[in-house]
């Protein structure tokens, strides 16, 4: 079955429910009268609800209508593009230094506009202490709240516990504003002691 919009003489029904160019309800009229009104306004008669009885037609600029519909379709496709999901794994008894390192990774992922699946990996007797993983995930969610939000709350996933963080809207733009001129991968590495030489006097 064709889904092409019928316009003007392609609308082959005896009568239609007509909507004027300003959105006003004209009522049910003969197709000949609807076509004449559209022609007098130098506009098109466009069938907008073909399954109604009688079909609903609106007087409008069909070229403009098609352009706006195409723009909306493109915007919808952009919004539906799959977001990159990164993963960060932690142990429930992680030490502070490792935690700060992992948190830094999560922040960079969020600043880049990626979602982050955070996985707490339990081993052995740790599996009997799910509250450790829950508290750790809640702590991480609070610590990175400036960069993202908890999209999927902590939940048990087999032996692991997972949580999904999503970046705030416009995260990439804010990251560039905070770090102008910095490459996408982060700040340049600091020189090591072997790389530096004493300046001549």
From Swiss-Prot:
PROSITE patterns: IF3 (PS00938). GO terms for cellular component: cytosol; membrane. Residues 167-201 are annotated as: Disordered. Residues 169-178 have a biased composition (Basic residues). It holds the Pfam family IF3_C. Keywords: Cytoplasm, Initiation factor, Protein biosynthesis. Coiled coil: none annotated. It comes from the Bacteria. InterPro entries: T_IF-3_C_sf, T_IF-3_N_sf, Translation_initiation_fac3_CS, Translation_initiation_fac_3, Translation_initiation_fac_3_C, Translation_initiation_fac_3_N. It is found in: Cytoplasm. One of its GO terms (biological process) is ribosome disassembly. One of its GO terms (molecular function) is ribosome binding. Monomer. IF-3 binds to the 30S ribosomal subunit and shifts the equilibrium between 70S ribosomes and their 50S and 30S subunits in favor of the free subunits, thus enhancing the availability of 30S subunits on which protein synthesis initiation begins. Belongs to the IF-3 family. This is Translation initiation factor IF-3. It comes from Mycobacterium bovis (strain ATCC BAA-935 / AF2122/97). The gene is infC.
């Amino acid at each position: 079955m064709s889904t092409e919009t019928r316009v003007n003489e392609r609308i082959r029904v005896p009568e239609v429910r007509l909507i004027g160019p300003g959105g006003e309800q004209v009522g049910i009229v003969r197709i000949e009268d609807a076509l004449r009104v559209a022609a007098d306004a130098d506009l098109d008669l466009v069938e907008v609800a073909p399954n109604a009885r009688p079909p609903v037609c609106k007087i409008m600029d069909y070229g403009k209508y098609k352009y706006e519909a195409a723009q909306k379709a493109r915007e919808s496709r952009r919004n539906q593009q799959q977001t990159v999901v990164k993963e960060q794994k932690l142990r429930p008894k992680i030490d502070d230094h490792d935690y700060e390192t992992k948190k830094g990774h999560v922040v960079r992922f969020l600043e880049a506009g990626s979602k982050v699946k955070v996985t707490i990996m339990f081993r052995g007797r740790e599996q009997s202490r799910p509250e450790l993983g829950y508290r750790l995930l809640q702590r991480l969610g609070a610590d990175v709240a400036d960069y993202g939000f908890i999209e999927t709350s902590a939940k048990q996933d087999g032996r692991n516990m997972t949580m999904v963080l999503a970046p705030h809207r416009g995260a990439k733009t804010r990251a560039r504003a905070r770090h102008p001129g910095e490459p996408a991968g982060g700040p340049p590495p600091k020189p090591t002691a072997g790389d530096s030489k004493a300046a001549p006097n």
